[in-house]
A protein has these predicted regions:
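Interfacial segments of transmembrane alpha-helices in multi-pass membrane proteins
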Residues: 37, 41-45, 347, 378, ...
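Surface-exposed amphipathic alpha-helical segments in non-transmembrane regions
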Residues: 112, 130-139, 154, 167-187, ...
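Signature of alpha-helical transmembrane segments and their immediate interfacial
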Residues: 19-21, 89-143
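Helix-loop junctions and hydrophobic alpha-helical segments within the transmembrane domains
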Residues: 2-27, 97
Length: 515
């Protein structure tokens, strides 16, 4: 523009042109930085995912500012051709002015444009309400983070309590045989009686505690995402029904666990049950679990409730053992050998690279029967061999319930996932909520509900606190809202410094709530 209106050499025009736009450019740069920088202070597990955004964006804006003041003027000097003074823009300005008057004119003119302005405001309000209602009408799925396309899945299997390790391994092999038929699966590894190698997701879900014969994991590796047409989430949805059929046949429960795109949670949908009595909490959780199962599209339902199972306790008759001259340590050692075995000596082989232990134990089919165990003999002080059945008696008990705690409060967890048309845990959470709230409890009263924090008095009555992906969503939007509030204050101060006015920045920033 300056070149077209003046015959001054381009090298002399460029500094004035840069000075003309320099102030607004600097203001815009630091305004963007002020808007993004508070995101670096988002707390919780979402913080590490958010912090690169303000850092990288701020660096990009500063680099962009340097390019605007250094590189762009130099390129303009090298590439632009000198132009003589003229009035080439008058016609363009006339067309632009005509367009401006045609669009803006009806809204100006004081009282004359009042009806048009009211129509504009009403239209904007209707559009805002329509946009907000899209999530409520389920035309747009409200979800914290989209599904990622990872190259792995994890199958978590829980067999009935007391299932032998061999049976668990057999079920995993049956599932593995099916997984081998899936085109996108390159390989898999089954782990019976223990957990797969712990990843970040497993660390939060405490998979390291999965050490029992009835527990199993299958680590499934998929082809590279560039070598397959289906997303990993689509594959997970496709393999779940056949795997669930195998699990139901063996009385097992199954979870298809995907690597989350953001911070991991215990489960996408988590209900924490609090109350004055743990037995009552378990009863409430069992009813809640039934509501989870009955809700449409809710899968992978589980609860932190141990199955009722018998337990056998072996007690030593101390008086009789002392009378026969048998040490209690010898009795315990014999029982340990029968149940778990013991390495008694290494096998000496000249060609062996590592020590080969010689293990003494009962055959597996006998180790599982207490009668076989009690037929083992220990040597008394006089040299006689005495069977354990004369010194040990078995007590049949019920298995104790594991008591979980969170922030020192006893809690029972009920968890689930969403897999259906909506595929967002928030919709599943509110579907379950509509089924349980307002109904009387068998223990008396109604169930309390908390979304943000635990009950102030967890022993006053039974209540649930929603957790999982909802908690991450709430904390993220809470922190981001506070961060953008600070950002707006910084933007306001920058604009005040630019225009030397406290009112003009408010007018300039008025459209921000509409974005």
């Amino acid at each position: 523009r300056r070149g077209a209106l003046s015959e001054t050499p381009l090298a002399e025009l460029i500094p004035d042109a840069v000075d003309e736009v320099g102030g607004p450019t600097i203001l815009a740069t630091f305004t963007v930085i002020a808007a993004l920088l508070p995101m670096a202070f988002v707390s919780g597990l979402m913080g590490p995912y958010m912090s690169p955004i303000p850092i990288n964006a701020s660096m990009g804006m500063l680099i962009s500012l340097a390019i605007a003041f250094i590189v762009t003027p130099w390129l303009a000097l090298k590439l632009l051709k000198p132009q003589g003074a003229g009035h080439g823009e008058e016609q363009g300005e006339t067309r632009a002015l005509r367009l401006f008057r045609g669009v803006i004119g009806p809204f100006l003119g004081g009282a004359k444009g009042g009806a048009a302005r009211m129509t504009l405001y009403t239209g904007i309000l209707v559009l805002i309400l329509g946009a907000v209602s899209l999530a409520g009408l389920k035309l747009v799925v409200l979800k914290m983070l989209p599904f990622d396309n990872k190259s792995e899945l994890q199958i978590v299997v829980d067999m009935p309590t007391g299932t032998p390790l061999e049976h668990t391994s057999g079920v995993l092999q049956e599932m593995g045989s099916y997984l081998a038929t899936v085109a996108e699966v390159t390989d898999y590894q089954a782990y019976a009686g223990t957990s797969a190698p712990i990843n970040f997701n497993g660390l939060v879900r405490q998979y390291s505690l999965r050490q029992s014969p009835e527990l199993g994991d299958i680590q499934v590796n998929l082809a590279d995402k560039h070598q397959r047409s289906r997303q990993s989430h689509e594959i997970a949805l496709a393999v779940r029904p056949p795997l669930e059929a195998i699990a139901r046949h063996h009385g097992a429960s199954l979870k298809v666990v995907e690597v989350p795109p953001g911070p991991p949670v215990q489960a996408p949908i988590v209900a924490e049950v609090y109350g004055p009595d743990y037995a009552g909490q378990i009863a409430v959780a069992q009813k809640l679990r039934a509501d989870f199962i009955a809700a449409p599209d809710i899968v992978d339902v589980d609860a932190s409730i141990d199955e009722a199972a018998p337990k056998l306790r072996l007690r030593v008759d101390r008086a009789k053992a002392a009378l026969m001259g048998v040490a209690q340590g010898d009795i315990v050692a014999a029982i340990r050998i029968g149940l778990a075995g013991e390495d008694v000596t290494p096998l000496h082989e000249s060609g062996a690279k590592y020590e080969v232990p010689v293990r003494v134990s009962l055959p597996p089919e006998q180790a599982s029967r207490v009668e076989s165990l009690l037929r083992l003999k220990v040597r008394a002080a006089g040299g006689n061999l005495i069977p354990l059945s004369e010194l040990v008696f078995a007590e049949k008990l019920a298995r104790e319930q594991t008591v979980y705690h969170k922030d020192l409060l006893p809690v029972v967890y009920v968890v689930g996932d969403m897999a259906g048309k909506l595929d967002s845990p928030l919709y599943g959470m509110f579907e379950i909520r509509s089924r349980i709230m307002g109904k009387p409890l068998a223990q008396g009263g109604s169930l309390g509900e908390y979304f943000i924090s635990q009950p102030d008095d967890a022993y006053a009555g039974y209540a649930i606190k929603w957790d999982g992906e909802w908690q991450v969503t709430y904390e993220t939007f809470r922190d981001m809202g506070l961060a953008y509030g600070v950002g707006l204050i910084l933007i306001y101060l920058l604009v005040v410094a630019q225009f030397k006015s406290y009112l003009v920045p408010l007018i300039i920033m008025a459209p921000i709530p509409l974005t």
